């Protein structure tokens, strides 16, 4: 068996990626989230496949087909809630994975990091088009508001919006194409995830100390396979608790009402994992400025490798930047909270302050603290 896995053309790839892969001996549980994201992706594809067997992407029947899945399909309610809450678990793991990458300086592996940003954007696009499919009030109005943002693009904006809608409003054509996008995008994510792994295995994993670990590596199996299994069991436990005890806690009550173009909900907001970006969008009074800030709130992650001037790898021995990092995390939580609040004082003002802080930390404070820490080392 050992000879087969080392020589067989297909098994050799698996062997070099998951069995004999030399891995730093000191990587902590923060490194588990890559495998957890893979697990989340598999859960989403499987549950999504079974949902697609019963769902109809037609404006007249979409809402009732989701109700039919929950009422009449064997364990349909479980599949639906695993899929809905699985998306939330996916984004929790994704945020932690990116946060770990920033804290431990994994952005220095620039190809892996940039593919990761593409993965992040593709996952956000998948979640957005998926949220439209149940055709509830928030699905419809969320789709209308977010797609309408493209009209801010000079000259081609309005044409682009009508092209995406397939008409002059969000309607049957929009729902059908969003279903098609939602079905195909997870497979594109899977392909990008493999490229992400390919680039990672070219350079080898980073580690918590930020030091070179070439002299202290151990095989991935059995050490990290068992460690990942523990993480997967814990993830499944949390997901099952969410799906079985609190299935609608992260959803929006407006989505229990079928989509009605003549009745606008009091507060239109996306799913919780987009609220930080939505708060940044709303904090700028100008429409085009808001859209640019929304896009930059994700693309600014690409600035981390470019703005990095530190002589040390990661934040483990850098107390000043550590403080700034945790302010950044708290600021993100504030943005998430503000994104779900009505557009009125003082929420608008807090949103504007938090949005300025978000960009200032990445562009100004972290590079300045890097320079200060570099000078302290020289003393």
UniProtKB/Swiss-Prot annotation:
Residues binding a ubiquinone: 201
Localization in the cell: Mitochondrion inner membrane
Sorted UniProt keywords: Electron transport, Heme, Iron, Membrane, Metal-binding, Mitochondrion, Mitochondrion inner membrane, Respiratory chain, Transmembrane, Transmembrane helix, Transport, Ubiquinone
Residue ranges that the Swiss-Prot or TrEMBL entry lists as coiled coil: none
Residues the entry annotates as binding heme b b562: 83, 182
Presence of the UniProt keyword Cytoplasm in the record: no
GO terms of molecular function: metal ion binding; ubiquinol-cytochrome-c reductase activity
Cofactor binding remark: Binds 2 heme b groups non-covalently.
The keyword Electron transport appears for this protein: yes
Binding site for heme b b566: 97, 196
Principal cellular location given in the protein's record: mitochondrion
Gene3D superfamilies: Cytochrome Bc1 Complex, Chain C
Membrane topology note: Multi-pass membrane protein
Biological process according to GO: mitochondrial electron transport, ubiquinol to cytochrome c
Family per record: Belongs to the cytochrome b family.
PANTHER family (alphabetical): CYTOCHROME B
Subunit (UniProt): The cytochrome bc1 complex contains 11 subunits: 3 respiratory subunits (MT-CYB, CYC1 and UQCRFS1), 2 core proteins (UQCRC1 and UQCRC2) and 6 low-molecular weight proteins (UQCRH/QCR6, UQCRB/QCR7, UQCRQ/QCR8, UQCR10/QCR9, UQCR11/QCR10 and a cleavage product of UQCRFS1). This cytochrome bc1 complex then forms a dimer.
Name of the protein: Cytochrome b
Native source organism of the sequence: Akodon boliviensis
């Amino acid at each position: 068996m050992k000879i087969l896995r080392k020589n067989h053309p297909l098994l050799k790839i698996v062997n070099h990626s998951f069995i004999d892969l030399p891995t730093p001996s000191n990587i902590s549980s923060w490194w588990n989230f890559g495998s957890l994201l893979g697990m989340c992706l598999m859960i989403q594809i499987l549950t999504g496949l079974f949902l697609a067997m019963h769902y109809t992407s037609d404006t007249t029947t979409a809402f009732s087909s989701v109700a039919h899945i929950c009422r009449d399909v064997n364990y349909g309610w479980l599949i639906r809630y695993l899929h809905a809450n699985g998306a939330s678990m996916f984004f929790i793991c994704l945020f932690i994975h990116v946060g770990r990458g920033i804290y431990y300086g994994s952005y220095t592996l620039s190809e892996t990091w940039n593919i990761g940003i593409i993965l992040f954007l593709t996952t956000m696009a998948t979640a957005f088009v998926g949220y439209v499919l149940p055709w509830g009030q928030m699905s419809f109005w969320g789709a209308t508001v977010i797609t309408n943002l493209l009209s801010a693009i000079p000259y081609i904006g309005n044409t682009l919006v009508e092209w995406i809608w397939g008409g002059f409003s969000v309607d049957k054509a929009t729902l059908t194409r969003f279903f098609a996008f939602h079905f195909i995008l997870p497979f594109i994510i899977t392909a990008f995830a493999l490229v992400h792994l390919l680039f990672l295995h070219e350079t080898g994993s980073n580690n918590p100390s930020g030091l070179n670990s070439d002299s202290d590596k151990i095989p991935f199996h059995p050490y990290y396979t068992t460690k990942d299994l523990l993480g997967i069991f814990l993830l499944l436990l949390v997901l099952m608790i969410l799906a079985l005890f609190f299935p609608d806690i992260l959803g929006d009550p407006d989505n229990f009402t079928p989509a009605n173009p003549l009745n606008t909900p009091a507060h239109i907001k996306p799913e919780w994992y987009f609220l930080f970006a939505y708060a940044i969008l709303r904090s700028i009074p100008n429409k085009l400025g808001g859209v640019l800030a929304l896009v930059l709130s994700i693309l600014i992650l690409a600035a981390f490798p470019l703005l990095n001037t530190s002589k040390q790898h990661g934040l483990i021995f850098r107390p000043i930047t550590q403080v700034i990092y945790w302010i950044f995390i708290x600021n993100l939580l504030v943005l998430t909270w503000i994104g779900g609040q009505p557009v009125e004082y003082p929420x608008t003002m807090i949103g504007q302050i938090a949005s300025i802080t978000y960009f200032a930390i990445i562009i100004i404070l972290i590079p300045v603290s890097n320079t200060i820490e570099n000078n302290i080392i020289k003393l």
